[in-house]
Amino acid sequence: MLFSINKLRDLANLDKQITNDQIIDAINKIGFEVESVKNFLNVSKIKFGLIKKVYKNPNASNLNVCEIEFEDKMRIIQTTAQNVEQNKYIVAFVENSTFGKIKIEAKEIKGTFSQGMLCSLEELGFDKSLIRDEFQDKIFLLDKADLKQDPIDFFDLDDQIVDVSILSNRSDANGYFIMALELSAFFETKTNFEIKNEIFKIHPNLKVDETNTLDFVLIEPQKELKKISLKDQILIMKSNIKTFNDLVDLTNLNLIMNAMPTHVYDKDKISNEISVKKVSQEVSILGNKKISLDNNLVVCSKEKPISIAGVIGIADFGSDQNTKNFVFEIGRFKTLDIQKSIKSVKLDTQSSKLSSKKISSGTFKMALNFLTSYFDSQVLVSKNLKDKKESFNFVWEDLNKFLNTDVKKMPHFNRVLKSLNILGFEFKDNKVYLPTYRHDIEHVQDILEEFLRFYGYENLVFEAPNIKNFETKNYEEYLNFIPYLNYSETRTYSLVSKDKNIFNPFNFKENINLETFHSKEREQIRNSMILSMEEVLQYNLKRKVENVNIFEIGIINNSQRSLALLSNQKSFNRFKEDVESILKDKLYSFEKGGFDFSHPLESIIIKDNDQLIGYIIRANAKDFEEDFVYAEILIDKLRNKKIENKSLNYLPLKTLDINFEVPSENGLFEVYKTLEKNEKIYSYKLIDHYQKNQISIYTIRIWAFEENIEELKTLFNL
């Protein structure tokens, strides 16, 4: 939705000391989102003038010479516009005025000196396609103006247009009045408008069938329409809506001021019997575009469709400059009916967008009052609207459990209460009474959201919870997580033969023998799961399953719980990364080391407090028939990392590349251990390696915050 900052400022009665930037910031803080801000002003130093005399340039019949009185002096200005009249007021560019990047200067034209240029609306910065036809390619004339007043101030040209994204449940805020009320609540001001609750005379002859509607009212004025001022036309154009005539412009004013779609009909073309029904036929909508209706909701005069409900009018019944008698219609309809019609018409307008959203009874009532104000409330209506405030049980203590504090003792409570009262909320008798324009408030949580919008999320004081770390023997975390790494769970026997129980990587002191057993194949509890996992691999390979990634949580030795992983598909480093992902919340360190049955170059042991708790290896070809990488971890011995709450640092990370000279590959693990223990280091990565004689040189890139980089340079003697 496009809003004029000047109009919002005026309606919300905001002091000039409140800057545009503060208003924009307030819109964001109270739950809306400013998508863009555009400066509207494209001119400077223009003036009001009074045409005292008009005559033709003797050397050019298409040029009119105008003698014009300005606040500072008389000037002669020539123009090709043929609608200039004596005793009419105009707006003009005079010497040193600017139009975009063009500076206006006095100059001779066809033998007559011209001291400026008369303004059209297009030259003031308005889109030509939005200007009324009567002003197209013409100078706009005024019946009255104050020569001392600056036209830029009078027409609100020194303005900013903000494009605000409105939440779908806040359709009411698509209008100036409610957005201004929101700003008034934020800045604690009294608005320059009043939400009234008027009662009108009922039309004696109108018969309205409201079936298929949520609310529907016809309004027939009994007094002449107040002229839509040029200032109001400019406001409509600032919303990127075309101006047509006073009747249509009034409906568009109601749209932007109250977010209420409104239609106007030529009264002489419709009957007094109006109904809302679903119709299937071909019609010609405004703009003479023909469409086929397929059970679409329409407003009918007797049996003739006069508009597609909430979307657009039918061409034959619209108003124009010649319309003398007219009827306005405002209605609320089911959103599904409107959305279906939008698809049929294939026309996406501001009116159809708002009709497709839920509209409250309060918005409906405000729109009716605004519309009738242009006739001094001298109207006949098909019915009057009920305006009852909804309520539900509520006490402020209801919010305490959500905020973990006594709400009434919060430092800004009274200020927020005042803001909510400005919005129309009433808190009394253990109830909250809701503004009638709000349809989105239903629960205590909604009141909490309203409270926090004006309290300010940035003003909340958060207290970190007291987290007590504990160890758990629940293995579900592994069973749920590991499959996401592309491993399938398998099940194997814990019992093996004595001949096969030859691998003891954890150095168990004794084998666990069964006193009774069914066969020699199942007489001991295994000391490692590696042979069992290889058997599963071989089983799958025989069945042409070539890529095998498996895991199991099983028993080894004296009821030790072991996590085993095997892959014949992944590289050693990729497999190691999987293990790191599984152990991300555990205390451990990697060290160079291995066993007789592991590959000499691809083998790592896992320790915690110098105790062996696991290993990662590639199987040695002399001991195993298949090629695979394997990991085994005593998960009952894993300890959880201590959870610490730290403030988030939003500054960018810096990098530092350091060369480490180590005599052997095992020395690299010592470097890693040193880096892991340093709390100043955010992360690190090996990026290069080369051999120099008997020395290995590793280049490691370190990421850290800027304030820690210098300390790290000192630590590593850089």
Swiss-Prot record:
<dbReference type="GO" id="GO:0009328">
    <property type="term" value="C:phenylalanine-tRNA ligase complex"/>
</dbReference>
<keyword id="KW-0694">RNA-binding</keyword>
<feature type="binding site">
    <location>
        <position position="450"/>
    </location>
    <ligand>
        <name>Mg(2+)</name>
    </ligand>
</feature>
<dbReference type="InterPro" id="IPR045864">
    <property type="entry name" value="aa-tRNA-synth_II/BPL/LPL"/>
</dbReference>
<keyword id="KW-0030">Aminoacyl-tRNA synthetase</keyword>
<dbReference type="Pfam" id="PF01588">
    <property type="entry name" value="tRNA_bind"/>
</dbReference>
<comment type="similarity">
    <text>Belongs to the phenylalanyl-tRNA synthetase beta subunit family. Type 1 subfamily.</text>
</comment>
<dbReference type="InterPro" id="IPR002547">
    <property type="entry name" value="tRNA-bd_dom"/>
</dbReference>
<keyword id="KW-0648">Protein biosynthesis</keyword>
<protein>
    <recommendedName>
        <fullName>Phenylalanine--tRNA ligase beta subunit</fullName>
        <ecNumber>6.1.1.20</ecNumber>
    </recommendedName>
</protein>
<dbReference type="GO" id="GO:0000287">
    <property type="term" value="F:magnesium ion binding"/>
</dbReference>
<dbReference type="InterPro" id="IPR005147">
    <property type="entry name" value="tRNA_synthase_B5-dom"/>
</dbReference>
<dbReference type="GO" id="GO:0000049">
    <property type="term" value="F:tRNA binding"/>
</dbReference>
<keyword id="KW-0436">Ligase</keyword>
<dbReference type="GO" id="GO:0006432">
    <property type="term" value="P:phenylalanyl-tRNA aminoacylation"/>
</dbReference>
<dbReference type="InterPro" id="IPR005146">
    <property type="entry name" value="B3/B4_tRNA-bd"/>
</dbReference>
<feature type="binding site">
    <location>
        <position position="449"/>
    </location>
    <ligand>
        <name>Mg(2+)</name>
    </ligand>
</feature>
<feature type="domain" description="tRNA-binding">
    <location>
        <begin position="40"/>
        <end position="153"/>
    </location>
</feature>
<feature type="binding site">
    <location>
        <position position="446"/>
    </location>
    <ligand>
        <name>Mg(2+)</name>
    </ligand>
</feature>
<dbReference type="InterPro" id="IPR009061">
    <property type="entry name" value="DNA-bd_dom_put_sf"/>
</dbReference>
<dbReference type="Pfam" id="PF17759">
    <property type="entry name" value="tRNA_synthFbeta"/>
</dbReference>
<keyword id="KW-0963">Cytoplasm</keyword>
<keyword id="KW-0820">tRNA-binding</keyword>
<keyword id="KW-0460">Magnesium</keyword>
<feature type="domain" description="B5">
    <location>
        <begin position="387"/>
        <end position="462"/>
    </location>
</feature>
<dbReference type="InterPro" id="IPR045060">
    <property type="entry name" value="Phe-tRNA-ligase_IIc_bsu"/>
</dbReference>
<dbReference type="InterPro" id="IPR012340">
    <property type="entry name" value="NA-bd_OB-fold"/>
</dbReference>
<comment type="subunit">
    <text>Tetramer of two alpha and two beta subunits.</text>
</comment>
<keyword id="KW-0067">ATP-binding</keyword>
<dbReference type="Pfam" id="PF03483">
    <property type="entry name" value="B3_4"/>
</dbReference>
<keyword id="KW-0547">Nucleotide-binding</keyword>
<dbReference type="InterPro" id="IPR033714">
    <property type="entry name" value="tRNA_bind_bactPheRS"/>
</dbReference>
<feature type="binding site">
    <location>
        <position position="440"/>
    </location>
    <ligand>
        <name>Mg(2+)</name>
    </ligand>
</feature>
<dbReference type="InterPro" id="IPR004532">
    <property type="entry name" value="Phe-tRNA-ligase_IIc_bsu_bact"/>
</dbReference>
<dbReference type="InterPro" id="IPR041616">
    <property type="entry name" value="PheRS_beta_core"/>
</dbReference>
<dbReference type="Pfam" id="PF03484">
    <property type="entry name" value="B5"/>
</dbReference>
<keyword id="KW-0479">Metal-binding</keyword>
<dbReference type="GO" id="GO:0005524">
    <property type="term" value="F:ATP binding"/>
</dbReference>
<dbReference type="GO" id="GO:0004826">
    <property type="term" value="F:phenylalanine-tRNA ligase activity"/>
</dbReference>
<dbReference type="InterPro" id="IPR020825">
    <property type="entry name" value="Phe-tRNA_synthase-like_B3/B4"/>
</dbReference>
